């Protein structure tokens, strides 16, 4: 993170950890990061821990998933696909877990449309940066 913005990822290798090898993690710089880790919201959770109270959610932290409601989950997955912290976007079930939508339900349609939506958002943001 730089200046209150996600600017990439640090990737730890589980195989390296299991083998007890001393290998540094990979550092990847990126203009945007998408958390599509599903229910666990792994990337959003790390940001929440490192910069408490800064997420763009009603409670400024991960809202958590609500009970299963397939019909609602389909539409809310799309609505919740957005930027949650500068440079960090959420998609799929990570979006519902972050913004408090119902768990499960969006099996194919909502999940695919969520990925398409976040890709379009990033393309738009990248083209706006070039101007």
Which role does the model predict for each range below?
Residues 1-131:
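Residues forming the flavin
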């Amino acid at each position: 993170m730089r200046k209150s913005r996600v600017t990439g990822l640090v990737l730890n290798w589980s195989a390296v950890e299991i083998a007890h090898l001393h290998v540094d993690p990979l550092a990847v710089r990126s203009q945007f990061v998408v958390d599509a880790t599903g229910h666990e919201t792994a990337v959003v959770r790390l940001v929440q821990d490192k910069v408490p109270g800064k997420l763009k959610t009603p409670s400024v932290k991960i809202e958590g998933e609500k009970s299963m409601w397939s019909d609602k989950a389909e539409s809310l997955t799309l609505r919740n696909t957005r930027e949650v912290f500068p440079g960090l976007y959420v998609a799929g079930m990570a979006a519902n877990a972050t913004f408090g939508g119902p768990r499960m339900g969006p099996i194919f349609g909502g999940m695919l449309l969520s990925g398409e939506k976040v890709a379009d958002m990033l393309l738009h943001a990248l083209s706006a940066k070039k101007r």
